[in-house]
């Protein structure tokens, strides 16, 4: 009698394969996780002073919501079809517990309350160094339960290149977007807003924050952070903008790269206290490990093969 044995093809075996669906594993690692069409805006407008964004001009922008009670939490950015990068503090409760299945993501929205498509969350990943009583390692990743469908309202943003040094952003203009509060009772926060800001040196930023009794900032402003804001204050990210992108748009190609994630600040738009952002280039390897692992999981599913004896 022939006996069939069930043999499982595992991920470790697949990694020895030189080519999978025409693309080598090693070349995928070297190439990084940016999609080739990332960072292109279907609607390109000039930002003058900041205000309400042209609808769908930042198509990677997402809103993160709490399920029960239903309320808006934070912003985030699509970096591929199943991954949204945001701030760790958006994904952890005040008691240090992960939100996990108590949140969902809304993509393709301009009016965050009345437009867009909801996606369920498969997994929440918070950087292993993050502590809810600290501002360090403030980065997290949301993995969606199914891939988003790209269109003129939904696109991925580029992230910094894999295995490259920090880019000097001092004196560079960057852009933030979000549905956070504006401080003006007559202005709604349900429509996406945009603001161009100058980057502030970490040295100057640290001088300002060292004057505060910040228990969450015992190591000061580090190289894993970016500061941006006007010396006179008046315009800044605020409550509800957390987790959203700090972006740089290449003036030649028009391509947009997310360089930071809205993390924290001293109140909102205070003079000489710029907003502080998690520097994405410090965490590209971390993002690479997670997102590449997810792509491998989809490529190398466990497949049963029956071999007759």
From Swiss-Prot:
GO-annotated molecular function: serine-type endopeptidase activity; serine-type peptidase activity
Organism expressing this protein natively: Tachypleus tridentatus
Pfam families per record: Trypsin (PF00089)
Family: Belongs to the peptidase S1 family.
Keyword Repeat: no
Disulfide bonding pattern of the chain: 38-158, 74-90, 205-227, 238-268
Superkingdom of this protein's organism: Eukaryota
Tissues expressed in: Expressed in the hemocytes (at protein level).
Function per UniProt: Component of the heterodimer clotting factor G which may play a role in defense mechanisms against fungi. Initiates a (1->3)-beta-glucan-sensing clotting pathway whereby the alpha subunit binds to glucans containing (1->3)-beta linkages, which are components of the fungal cell wall, and the beta subunit catalyzes the activation of proclotting enzyme.
Keywords: Disulfide bond, Glycoprotein, Hemolymph clotting, Hydrolase, Protease, Serine protease, Signal, Zymogen
UniProt xrefs under PANTHER family: ACROSIN-RELATED (PTHR24252), HYALIN (PTHR24252:SF7)
One example of a Gene Ontology biological process annotation: hemolymph coagulation
Identification of the protein by name: Clotting factor G beta subunit
Record: active site: 89, 138, 242
Residues with attached carbohydrate: 100, 206
Cleavable signal peptide: 1-31
Biotech utility: Clotting factor G is a component of the Limulus test used to detect bacterial endotoxins in fluids.
Subunit structure: Clotting factor G is a heterodimer composed of two non-covalently associated subunits, alpha and beta. Upon activation, converted to a two-chain active form linked by a disulfide bond. Forms a covalent heterodimer with intracellular coagulation inhibitor 3/LICI-3.
Activity regulation note: Binding to (1->3)-beta-D-glucan to alpha subunit, induces autocatalysis and activation of beta subunit. Inhibited by intracellular coagulation inhibitor 3/LICI-3 and to a lesser extend by intracellular coagulation inhibitor 2/LICI-2.
Catalytic activity: Selective cleavage of 98-Arg-|-Ile-99 bond in Limulus proclotting enzyme to form active clotting enzyme
The keyword Ion transport belongs to this UniProt entry's keyword annotation: no
EC number per UniProt: 3.4.21.85
Residue ranges of every copy of the Peptidase S1 domain listed in the record: 47-292
